[in-house]
Structures are given as C-alpha cells and as structure tokens.
Amino acid sequence: MTMVYANIFLAFTTSLMGLLMYRSHLMSSLLCLEGMMLSLFVMMTVTILNNHFTLASMAPIILLVFAACEAALGLSLLVMVSNTYGTDYVQNLNLLQC
C-alpha cells in the first residue's frame, strides 16, 4: 500500500470516526459524511488512473453527483430542522419522543 492510499484511507477512517463519535450536531455529521465521500472519490479516481480502467472512468463522476445530491438534501434538512426546533441537535430528530 503506497502512501497515497494510506493517506486516503486515513482520511476516510478519520471521517468515519468523527461521524460515529460526534453525533450531537447535524452539521458535524454532514461534514463527516462529506469527508467520507470526498475520500472515496479520490480513492476511486487514483485506483482507476493507476490500473488504467478505461471502462470505469465515469464512476468517480457518478459518485460525485450522488455526493452533491446528498449534500443538498442534508443542507435542506439542516435548514428545516433549525427553523422548526431552533437548534441543529440530532437528539431533536428522535421520532420516538413524546
């Protein structure tokens, strides 16, 4: 494993740990998800370029489109929750509360 792959894997792992540990605010969760998607995009692009997969060259662009859609939906959810509840705490999103 080269240093490029190790750094990208470390970025993905750091974003995943941030998502699992700091779940109090919705904005921090969205930032961690964006970090994970960005590291997956870079890993997929580097792998395709190193292995000369010409048939899979559209896959990183498709992943980037899905990441942009996920970011737009996440930001709209953040605006809706902050307008409704006044904060962006994740515990306010629990549907089982009375």
From Swiss-Prot:
Organism of origin: Neomonachus schauinslandi
Domain of life: Eukaryota
Record lineage: Eukaryota, Metazoa, Chordata, Craniata, Vertebrata
Broad class of enzyme this protein falls into: translocase
Principal location class: mitochondrion
Signal peptide: none
Biological role: Core subunit of the mitochondrial membrane respiratory chain NADH dehydrogenase (Complex I) which catalyzes electron transfer from NADH through the respiratory chain, using ubiquinone as an electron acceptor. Part of the enzyme membrane arm which is embedded in the lipid bilayer and involved in proton translocation.
Name this polypeptide is given: NADH-ubiquinone oxidoreductase chain 4L
GO terms of biological process kind: ATP synthesis coupled electron transport
Summary of subunit composition and partner proteins: Core subunit of respiratory chain NADH dehydrogenase (Complex I) which is composed of 45 different subunits.
InterPro entries with a match to the protein in the record: NADH_UbQ_OxRdtase_chain4L/K, NUOK/Mnh_C1-like
